[in-house]
Amino acid sequence: MKLNELSPPKGARTARKRKGRGPGSGLGKTAGKGHKGQKARSGGGVRPGFEGGQMPVHRRLPKRGFCNIFAKKIAAVNVRDLARFEADSVVDAAALREARLISGKVDGVKILGHGEITQALTVKADQWSESAKEKIEKAGGKIEAA
C-alpha cells in the first residue's frame, strides 16, 4: 500500500447537508425549519430557560441562604501534599503558593490529616486538625501558628 492509495473507510466521512438547495435535495424550501413561527425566523428562538410564559423553575423555587461578606476563605492543604517539601524545610503560605498548593486570595491556611508524611518539617499555618498535628510531630516535625 502506498500513501497515495490511502482513503478513509466507507461511511467515515459524510457529506455536509446543503440546506435550502431545491426540493430534490429533501432539505429545500424551508430547510428543515417547518412553516413560519418564531423558530423559523432568522435569529429566532427563545432564550435558555424560557418556558413559554409559564413561571420558570428558577423563579418557582424559593431563595435560600445568603453570602456572608465577612467569611474568611481558608485554603485546605493535606499532609500528603507536604511530602513534596525537602526535610527540615519551613513550610508557610509563601512556600505553599510557590509549590502551587494554594492559589488566589486566601485569608488563611488549614492543614488537614489525609495521607502520610515521613520527613520532618516546620509547618506554619493558621489552623490545623488534630490528626495533621499528630502526623507532623510523629515524623519529627513541628507545627506553629502563622
UniProtKB/Swiss-Prot annotation:
GO terms for biological process: translation. The keyword RNA-binding applies. GO terms for cellular component: cytosolic large ribosomal subunit. Keywords: Ribonucleoprotein, Ribosomal protein, RNA-binding, rRNA-binding. Residues 1-58 are annotated as: Disordered. Residues 22-31, 42-52 have a biased composition (Gly residues). Gene3D superfamilies: 3.100.10.10. It comes from the Bacteria. One of its GO terms (molecular function) is rRNA binding. Pfam families: Ribosomal_L27A (PF00828). Part of the 50S ribosomal subunit. HAMAP family: Ribosomal_uL15 (MF_01341). Belongs to the universal ribosomal protein uL15 family. Binds to the 23S rRNA. This is Large ribosomal subunit protein uL15.
